[in-house]
Amino acid sequence: MATFTDAEIDELFETSGTVIDSIITAQGKPVETVGRSAIPRGKTKALSSAWEKHGSVQSPASQDTPDRQDRSDKQLSTPEQVTPHDSPPATSTDQPPTQAADEAGDTQLKTGASNSLLSMLDKLSNKSSNAKKGPMVKPPGRASSTSDSTAGESTKPRKQSRETAEPGQGRPWKPGHRREHSISWTMGGVTTISWCNPSCSPIRAEPRQYSCTCGSCPATCRLCASDDVYDGGDITEGK
């Protein structure tokens, strides 16, 4: 049975630790994924620690003497221990076809998403502008009445008769008489005067009798038939 000194055992432990770190930090072919990281969750910290430890171990290992390096080469005879630990793991610069296709697909997806977003923003801006300057919408009830009244005015012209209001009056009238009264207060008491005016005459605040201007009002009516004959002008209490 072979025996080892303490220095050889320490060197063996150090070399095996370096090989284990090299195996851990070696990067194989990444798993082809779409939209996901190739590194499993929870492994990033372990890989970073292994790289740091590997870098710190390389510096003292490079200072060993040539004879110690020869002994370590003899001891490491297993196939998995032949992995070089002096150089960082090689990474391929060429992208596999699947990865290039994935990147092209991602670019197309981003472009399509951008176009969809722009079209959506255009639609929203058009809707907001139409809402601000949209056409005037007439109420349904008022629209029908307006159209009916307009059609009635166009097809049935208004009949101008004497029953319509004169320019100086605000209500319609018919040929005839209108009874008017004047009340006054004096020292002797209250005096009341009544008379008739044609319907076509204007209505004034002062007591006055007018003559017919339309030619259709009668000379007298049943109310003024018994009145004194009056020739027009201002009405006073003596008359």
Swiss-Prot record:
Gene Ontology CC: host cell cytoplasm; host cell nucleus
Record localization: Host cytoplasm; Host nucleus
Keyword Signal among UniProt keywords: no
A GO term for molecular function: metal ion binding
Binding residue positions for Zn(2+) 2: C200, C212, C214, C217
Ranges for region Disordered: 30-104, 126-180
Compositional bias (Basic and acidic residues): 65-74
Oligomer status and interactors: Interacts with host STAT1. Interacts with host TXNL1. Interacts (via C-terminus) with host CacyBP; this interaction inhibits host cell apoptosis.
Described function: Protects the virus against cell antiviral state by blocking host interferon signaling. Mechanistically, targets host phosphorylated STAT1 (phospho-STAT1) for degradation, thereby inhibiting the interferon alpha signaling pathway. Plays a role in the inhibition of host apoptosis. Interacts with and down-regulates the expression of host TXNL1. In turn, inhibits TXNL1-induced apoptosis through the BCL2-BAX-caspase 3 pathway. Inhibits host apoptosis also by negatively regulating host CacyBP/SIP. Promotes viral replication by activating the extracellular signal-regulated kinase (ERK) pathway.
Protein name: Non-structural protein V
Organism taxonomic ancestry: Viruses, Riboviria, Orthornavirae, Negarnaviricota, Haploviricotina
